């Protein structure tokens, strides 16, 4: 535990193959299977001087909000604290009717938004060289509460539209997207598309109680070029991300997708083909309150909440739950050459510190 603490709990020391009860990309459950399938796994890893408690949830059954609420219930149960009537009722709502579908007059003429398939272009100087063996790296970057506040202030002051609001989450997402885009400019043409998707939790848009554990998220799609992403101010890029969070648009798109799926006989959704060389998928857990759970173990509150390293997923970025002192840790998976550039990115290092 002391070694982990001194290293600040990096990806390199937190491998899911060693500390998790199931892998992130576990085999799919076969359609029509009648065998009950667990949806929440826990594993206690006893190490010298401490404990690593890992919790895996099946994403089809719950999002991060649902998973955190399930953990809050587990922590209450461990302390023999009874659940409230509201927790029991809202936790058992009928998922089949939780999202109101659009009426029969709605025409499914528009296709659901998809991540565009793009082809990246290496710079001419790199085209003649044989393609190197690509390696991928997971790494964490730490942002203190002070640096996050400074970043938000900088973003707010650099928005060209005077009435635009940007949050800390918007600002941090913009900084990370722009930093990754700069790293990719070392090998890609500036006109190459840069795709940024952002997972958004939308319970409040449908008056769904926060105690409902189901998967109620959608994603926004931002499509620019590397040149555009790197040339904008942090404030304008954050404002661009914020503009995709229009409540009515998010609500209608989600209902349209749900209605389209309800009218489709084949319910299996195949994942879209993605060019990971210019793709960033952001999932923010900053608001997930994970640092108050003690599970009555007598060990106090957790020192760190992290996402263990798993199979490389280039372009994936996770903002970990905000710590008690306000620290936010961003975990990301990139090509090794991109990560080396990112580790020396002066703009990123104004606010963040590399952990690994």
Model-derived regions, located:
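Short amphipathic alpha-helices and their capping loops
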Residues: 1, 87-156, 185, 194-206
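Non-catalytic N-terminal regions of enzymes
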Residues: 1-111, 153, 168-188, 281-356
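A near-ubiquitous, low-amplitude feature marking generic local secondary-structure context
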Residues: 25, 57, 126, 130-134, ...
